[in-house]
């Protein structure tokens, strides 16, 4: 709570705020990513991936009991692979996204997460490593070759790829935050659309936290523009759509003046 409040006051809306997140040195990231690349083709990795995906499938069904999806008509005619973007407010919000996409007829989705998540402990760490995830990193060598190859491979398999353009998770934060350009750069590079989502968080009672997924208009890359211009245009369009969805969902103007109600449960 205090970290989010401070980040908002400093206008650092994409910064890391969760106190429990692993903090890794460069050499630690190197070791984690090298191990991930070597291990992912192993039998042990495949077994753990199978188990994690089975757990995630069951969890997605459970999340569906408290999740409503609006705007599925915006996805009519979308059969091809695509990149999905969504506001990031929980380590398990990917289950909400997966439920919404399942309702739209998509059954396969890969989830991009931070390389530091590979170092997480316990159940959440297990799911972050094995539940059809792929790490993104600040390391240049990884982002130049390995990461684009992972994205391309998933899209070639006709999967959706979930990328959080807000970059960092802010737990239970309601407002959309500015989008980084990466998701849209890959959409242009691989000529796939962006499925734009905004998740509204609702509190029905003290113990019941529910969700409404707003499926927004699909954003297509403009092939007449150069890569940078096209990706920036998609980036701005997506952020504007998410901001408009916030206003519609909560019935209030979007500002980044901090209020207690910006965080569910406060």
Protein language model regions, located:
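Soluble or luminal CAZymes and related metallo-dependent hydrolases
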Residues: 47-51, 142-146, 235
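A generic secondary-structure micro-motif detector
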Residues: 45-46, 114, 172-173
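Membrane-anchoring hydrophobic helices of lipid-metabolizing enzymes
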Residues: 1-98, 130-131, 210, 264-266
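Non-catalytic C-terminal accessory region of glycerolipid acyltransferases
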Residues: 1-24, 145-266
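Short amphipathic alpha-helical segments and helix-helix/interface helices
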Residues: 56-57, 98, 125, 151, ...
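Structural motif corresponding to alpha-helix initiation and N-cap regions
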Residues: 69-72, 121, 145-148
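Catalytic core of membrane glycerolipid acyltransferases/transacylases, capturing the structured
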Residues: 78-140
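Short, flexible loop segments at the rims of nucleotide/cofactor-binding pockets, characterized by
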Residues: 59-65, 137-142, 172-174
């Amino acid at each position: 709570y205090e970290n989010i409040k401070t980040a908002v006051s400093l206008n650092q809306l994409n910064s890391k705020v969760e106190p429990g997140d692993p903090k890794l040195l460069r050499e630690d990231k190197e070791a984690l990513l090298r191990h991930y690349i070597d291990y992912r083709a192993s039998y042990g990795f495949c077994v753990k991936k199978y188990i994690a995906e089975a757990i995630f499938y069951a969890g997605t069904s459970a999340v569906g009991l408290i999740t409503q999806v609006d705007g599925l008509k915006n996805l009519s005619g979308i059969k091809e692979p695509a990149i999905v973007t969504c506001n990031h407010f929980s380590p398990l919000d990917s289950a909400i996204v997966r439920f919404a996409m399942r309702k739209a007829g998509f059954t396969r989705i890969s989830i991009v997460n931070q390389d530091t998540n590979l170092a997480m402990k316990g159940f959440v760490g297990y799911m972050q490593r094995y539940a059809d995830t792929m790490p993104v990193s600040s390391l240049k060598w990884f982002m130049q070759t390995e990461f684009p190859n992972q994205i391309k491979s998933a899209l070639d398999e006709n999967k959706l790829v979930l990328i959080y353009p807000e970059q960092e998770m802010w737990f239970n934060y309601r407002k959309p935050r500015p989008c980084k350009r990466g998701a849209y750069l890959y959409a242009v590079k691989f000529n796939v659309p962006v499925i734009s989502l905004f998740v509204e968080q609702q509190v029905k009672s003290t113990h019941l936290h529910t969700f409404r997924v707003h499926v927004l208009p699909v954003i297509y890359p403009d092939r007449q523009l150069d890569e940078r211009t096209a990706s920036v245009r998609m980036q701005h369009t997506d952020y504007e759509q998410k901001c408009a969805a916030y206003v519609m969902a909560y019935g209030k103007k979007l500002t980044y003046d901090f209020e207690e109600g910006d965080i569910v449960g406060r």
